[in-house]
Amino acid sequence: MAKKSKIAKNDRRQETVARYATRRAELTEIIRRPSTPEAERRAAQQELRRQPRDASATRVRNRDSVDGRPRGYHRAFGLSRVNLREQAHAGFLPGVRKSSW
């Protein structure tokens, strides 16, 4: 089980990312567009730099939805490898079977 403070911090980061997502997308589009004047591009870069660090989506960590484990995460299920195995063996994941070859 991950520390509750780490899980809470990650949740706050997700909220911050959601709050700034549209403006960040607009600014990055202005910066990437080749037809943008240099002064406008610099202003967009400065505004992007002034935003909080936690507004970047890369700062959010994928965590297990059951216990918050940060490593061994499977996106398709939202679970870590440990909980994925336990729930698959218990039959809680429809369509998941143990492989044999």
Swiss-Prot record:
GO biological process: translation
GO molecular function, one term: structural constituent of ribosome
Family: Belongs to the universal ribosomal protein uS14 family.
Function text: Binds 16S rRNA, required for the assembly of 30S particles and may also be responsible for determining the conformation of the 16S rRNA at the A site.
NCBIfam families assigned: PRK08881.1 (NF006477)
Subunit details: Part of the 30S ribosomal subunit. Contacts proteins S3 and S10.
Cited PANTHER family: 30S RIBOSOMAL PROTEIN S14, SMALL RIBOSOMAL SUBUNIT PROTEIN US14A
Protein name: Small ribosomal subunit protein uS14A
Protein species of origin: Streptomyces avermitilis (strain ATCC 31267 / DSM 46492 / JCM 5070 / NBRC 14893 / NCIMB 12804 / NRRL 8165 / MA-4680)
